């Protein structure tokens, strides 16, 4: 499976299981806010930022679960949680219409020319 298919499938699955209901409500409010006021538009932007932050924290929770898999010497759980991390990232990219494959390629190209350990100690 390629990255584009992964993003599409992960997002569709998350959406079908209710993980984007908040975003859909925000978009409905956004459509109404356009006709209401600048304050309404500002609130929609804040709500979208909060929804993105929630999804980022879900990614962090999967990272924590992967760590626990290692701490408990459960390599199968660790592998499963790594998959969850990628799925959540792909879902977020799909929901925000980010071309994740392009972003990954650009970042990998950028990293080729960075200093050893990117100039840091570790």
What are these regions (language model features)?
Residues 1-82, 86-122:
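Flexible "arm" and connector segments at domain edges
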């Amino acid at each position: 499976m390629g990255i584009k298919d992964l993003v599409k499938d992960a997002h569709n699955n998350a959406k079908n299981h209710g993980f984007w209901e908040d975003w859909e409500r925000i978009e409905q409010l956004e459509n109404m806010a356009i006709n209401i006021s600048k304050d309404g538009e500002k609130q929609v932007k804040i709500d979208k930022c909060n929804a993105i932050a929630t999804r980022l924290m879900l990614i962090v929770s999967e990272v924590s679960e992967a760590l626990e898999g290692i701490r408990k010497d459960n390599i199968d759980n660790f592998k499963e949680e790594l998959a969850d991390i990628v799925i959540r990232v792909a879902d977020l990219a799909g929901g925000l219409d980010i071309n994740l494959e392009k972003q990954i390629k650009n970042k990998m190209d950028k990293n080729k020319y960075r200093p050893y350990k990117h100039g840091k100690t570790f």
